[in-house]
Amino acid sequence: AFKRALVGARAVAYSRAGASGIYFTALVERLGIASEVLARAVAIPMGFTGEKVASGEADMAIQQVSELMSVPGVAVAGPFPPEVQTVSTFDAAIFADAANPDGAAALMALLASPAAAKAYGDGGLVSRLPHS
């Protein structure tokens, strides 16, 4: 279904220089559909690919969910299927010689809080912490 959607789209928007676009071009190559999909693609140098869907220039946009959600008028269909999905992770640590280790610890506690997990979810991100 995923491959059919990509091949069947009039145009797919992706960011040429962004991490999602770099992954996408490699993925369509791996799936054997690059020539069909990229020939009709709308590649943008930077910015939000969802804007190309909102303007009618593309049927689909490829980008991180959090970026797609920020474009008014765009409905996010969902993430890629698990077998072709890639995940970006963000981690935090306190250096042994940190100038303000207590402040850093407080920030990390805030970032790991249930309130932060809710904010991540509201913004299209998924927390990997146990309470999320």
Language model feature labels by segment:
Residues A1-S132:
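Exported/periplasmic ABC-transporter solute-binding proteins
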